Amino acid sequence: MQEYYIGPDLNTQLAALLQKLNVTKVFLVRGKKSYTSCGASDVMDAVLNGRGIKTVCFFDFLTNPRVEDVRKGVHLCKSQCPNIILAVGGGSALDMAKLIRYHIYKETDSYIPLVVIPTTAGTGAETTHFSVCYINGEKQSIADSAMLPDYAFVCSELTSHNDAYLTACTGFDAVAQAIESYWSVNSTDESRSYSLKALGLLWKQLPLLIKNLDNKELRSEVAEGAYYAGRAIDITTTTAPHAFSYKFTSLYGIPHGHAVALTFPYFFALNLYGERLQSTLDSYEYGQRMKLLVQFLDADRSDFLSCQLHMSTYISSLGLSAKALTFDELASAVSSFNEQRGRNNPVVIDEEVKSGLQNYFMELKESDKE
């Protein structure tokens, strides 16, 4: 069971935890420039140096962690014998720390407590039991209970350095997580309660935050909403929009949240209509669930295109678009997607769905010419 803290005064809360755990040595997995620019370095210096805690830093890894980077981190961490692993950064830093702890546990049966502090709002890495890692250029999702952080601190002040684009990418990832978890075949009463709680903090607030980046109240709500979106997908995992997103990142360098947004309007409409559902779903219950989601998001469900346009308009308000990619680049996702995530989707992903997605991309590029 994870312990978590959401709010200000990170210094006091973290210091109290370190004292409780009798920490004398920390293996710190962190970002590079962002670690200083977000103010985390000042907080960590004050808390760790103030208690005389020895710190070993690891930041020698790419933005999208590779298995080679994980091996380097595992080797260094094992050689240092820390009391805890502390991760401070965006999704990549947190995933790296989770993978390091997981591999050490599997190799040595030694369980090192993991404390995470996200500096972006939206990846969900602080509250999930899975991580992503690139193996031979392919993005793999690895799930295990040993990757769930033991402690998470969500402090919105550390996200205040995020510019509009980063805020949009990570924030929309959280919105997508909440919605995908809600319609997932693995959805439960608990996960749906987390999804709706997340959307109540994200849906209206995120576009406002993009236009008012210095608004502390909006920052706080979005950070909290992102945490609960992570709680939701920790139960259900993600669905089709995530399944089709990975190639956009690995081949074309599109940040993850932006990559998810590229297909989201199509799958939003497809899943709200709910034709050709997975056999495990009750069509009446699913239909009632989608009615509530439509009301919650104030969406137009009068026809497929109106539903699709509703989400497209929302994503455009965040400044995210497909203009940077050609039709061929967009279409590459159709033939290459994560089948495991695809099976979580409420509507069966078959050739007709893939053809519909390709037509959607074609319409996108035609609209770019206008």
Which stretches of residues belong to each language-model region?
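C-terminal and late-domain segments of enzyme folds
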Residues: 168-228, 232
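ATP/NTP phosphate-donor binding region
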Residues: 1-84
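Short, amphipathic C-terminal "tail helix"
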Residues: 327-370
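Gly/Pro-rich interdomain helix-loop hinge
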Residues: 254, 258-329
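Short glycine/serine/threonine-rich phosphate/pyrophosphate-binding segments
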Residues: 11-14, 37-39, 67-68, 92-99, ...
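Short Gly/Thr/Asp-enriched flexible loops that form oxyanion-binding sites at enzyme active sites
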Residues: 43-44, 72-74, 93-108, 128-130
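A glycine/threonine-rich phosphate-anchoring loop and its flanking beta-alpha core
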Residues: 102-190, 281
